[in-house]
Amino acid sequence: MEVRQSIHSDHAKQLDTAGLRREFLIDTVFDADRYTMVYSHIDRIIVGGIMPVTQSVSIGNEVGKQLGVGYFLERRELGVINIGGPGTIDVDGKCYEIGPREALYVGQGARDLRFASLDSACPAKFYYNCAPAHTHYPNRKITPAEVSPQTLGDTKSSNRRTINKYMVPEVLPTCQLSMGLTELEEGNLWNTMPCHTHERRMEVYFYFNMAPDSCVFHMMGEPQETRHIVMRNEQAVISPSWSIHSGVGTRAYTFIWGMVGENQVFDDMDHLAITDLR
């Protein structure tokens, strides 16, 4: 487990490129036959990926020890979205088949988690967010047909995109975790522009479905002190509550967003005019 401390906005704006990447970029999300795990002090979110190739992968008691509890989800809930080939997630002996673009919510209290791929030549890629939880809500698989979609933007502004809300109150109950997948239409490059902040929640973006020679310029920082981080395929970036979070790619791309914090009201945002940015 890699631990990232929280950082004040006054400090962040003084960092150079290497410093920004060290604080906010999650460079490697998937590594064959193991889990990756980044623990952020910002709202205590845990972010990572699991890619079983030649064997199944379980999250053992060593994580519980690092969290000061008996086991990983003793006081946490978990959201998983599969961006790879078909796979399975075994939760306390119950097996869920999770195909491409399908998701699984695992409620607080689940003890045994095991992840596997159905085809090692096309392994599953389970991207996950994990947040503190105060009670148990039922485990549930979510398919693309069950999500709450919202299409926004237009081609004139190069931001036509569909926001697929997987783990939001209108789809299923969670303690605080919200997750979804946003896909840009071909020829569109911008996400979340005009941009916003939300003082009451933090957010993590995970960019994928990108060509090897493409990138996304992820915009961050306070609205009057903007910075950027160059993102490659299958990388994630942490966004504190004080930071904008937007991006423009050299080609269309897809990203998963995850939020934790004070509430689960999707539209609880502090909107910013483009003319306010510096």
Curated annotation (Swiss-Prot):
InterPro entries: KduI, KduI/IolB_isomerase, KduI_N, RmlC-like_jellyroll, RmlC_Cupin_sf
Residue sites binding Zn(2+) per the record: 196, 198, 203, 245
Cofactor entry: Zn(2+)
Disulfide bonds: none
Keywords annotated in UniProt: Isomerase, Metal-binding, Zinc
Domain of life, source organism: Bacteria
Family: Belongs to the KduI family.
Protein's job: Catalyzes the isomerization of 5-dehydro-4-deoxy-D-glucuronate to 3-deoxy-D-glycero-2,5-hexodiulosonate.
HAMAP family, sorted: KduI
Protein name per UniProt: 4-deoxy-L-threo-5-hexosulose-uronate ketol-isomerase
Provenance organism: Edwardsiella ictaluri (strain 93-146)
Gene giving rise to this polypeptide: kduI
